[in-house]
Amino acid sequence: MADKKLDTQLVNAGRSKKYTLGAVNSVIQRASSLVFDSVEAKKHATRNRANGELFYGRRGTLTHFSLQQAMCELEGGAGCVLFPCGAAAVANSILAFIEQGDHVLMTNTAYEPSQDFCSKILSKLGVTTSWFDPLIGADIVKHLQPNTKIVFLESPGSITMEVHDVPAIVAAVRSVVPDAIIMIDNTWAAGVLFKALDFGIDVSIQAATKYLVGHSDAMIGTAVCNARCWEQLRENAYLMGQMVDADTAYITSRGLRTLGVRLRQHHESSLKVAEWLAEHPQVARVNHPALPGSKGHEFWKRDFTGSSGLFSFVLKKKLNNEELANYLDNFSLFSMAYSWGGYESLILANQPEHIAAIRPQGEIDFSGTLIRLHIGLEDVDDLIADLDAGFARIV
């Protein structure tokens, strides 16, 4: 299916008859024990337990194999590991490749729990972490060490949405520490708007909770990797007991079928809102990768095939607690909630000092309150009207 366009791939990926048993969708196979008809059948399953053969529930069932196959087809990987959430996918992908004395180099705009895992957990294991500016490009060589084992990217960056120059970073890393494992949190692009492995990245990680599930009703993480990393990532995850239930795997596979049309709507609506915000007199800056002038926009334009619905903007004013509560509490369509990627529109606020506190060795260049939006599938004119009413509450 690699020669087919994305929408066709999304509809068909992982839907072989082996997994559907003649139905349209993959079967939901819930199992812990899987029965062998003979000693020889057990031996065969044991030999092939890591290659999509039914062996034991923790290795997966037909439901899991269908999703894993789909993810490999969509992201061009040699294998896919499923995790109970995105944070588990990040932590276990890193753990699979590091040992005492290693160094991890991570963007300082990574998701806060990813940073915390490195600073609070890896530090106890004798692994050091340092941080780089998301727009550093080829100058990342200044931060590489002989013991750098993992270089961890996230593009766009969490909250402030900077886009990396990935080709420059990958080339620089390969020139200095060619054996380092390069990983990326690819959740914003849903693994399909930015084909990470095509750019020389080794492991593409997602909180599939977000766009792949698409309905805010299940939690799951994925890590798709190249052949070089597959066995080590797979076996580490197995030994760490990482798995998801069959129903969650099924829900995620089902979400893939509508991902293309949903992403197009997220792109269209979020960009329209971003353009409207960019002209608003109370807005200092809009951070949307698809909007000219946003940090790294030229890299988004070169390397991505579309946009999702998550972005942020900065108010000219820093709201006090009372003003912020009045602003956030009275939206009719935007709900306050963590996560994103579902059909619904969401809003959260961050004060500049909070962003500064979670930017290790980094600086922020704004002083107003930052608002993060996820633009859902509602009518965009209704969303703009709701935001406009919010601005009227800021005096």
Swiss-Prot record:
A Gene Ontology biological process in which this protein takes part is: protein homotetramerization
Question: Which reaction is catalysed here?
Answer: L,L-cystathionine + H2O = L-homocysteine + pyruvate + NH4(+); L-cysteine + H2O = hydrogen sulfide + pyruvate + NH4(+) + H(+); an S-substituted L-cysteine + H2O = a thiol + pyruvate + NH4(+)
Biochemical pathway: Amino-acid biosynthesis; L-methionine biosynthesis via de novo pathway; L-homocysteine from L-cystathionine: step 1/1
Q: Where is the signal peptide?
A: none
Q: Tell me, what is one Gene Ontology molecular-function annotation carried by this entry?
A: cysteine-S-conjugate beta-lyase activity
> Required cofactors, per record?
pyridoxal 5'-phosphate
The record, for CDD domains, names:
CGS_like (cd00614)
Q: What happens when the gene is disrupted?
A: Disruption of the gene increases the amounts of L-cysteine and L-cystine produced after 72 hours of cultivation.
| Entry-linked SUPFAM superfamilies | PLP-dependent transferases
EC number(s) reported in the record: 4.4.1.13, 4.4.1.28
Q: Indicate where this protein resides in the cell.
A: Cytoplasm
Which Pfam families does the UniProt entry name for this protein?
A: Cys_Met_Meta_PP
Domain of life (superkingdom): Bacteria
Name a GO CC annotation attached to this entry.
protein-containing complex
Entry-linked InterPro entries: Cys/Met-Metab_PyrdxlP-dep_enz (IPR000277), Cys_b_lyase_bac (IPR006233), Cys_met_metab_PP (IPR054542), PyrdxlP-dep_Trfase (IPR015424), PyrdxlP-dep_Trfase_major (IPR015421), PyrdxlP-dep_Trfase_small (IPR015422)
The name this protein carries in UniProt is: Cystathionine beta-lyase MetC
Q: Which organism is it from?
A: Escherichia coli (strain K12)
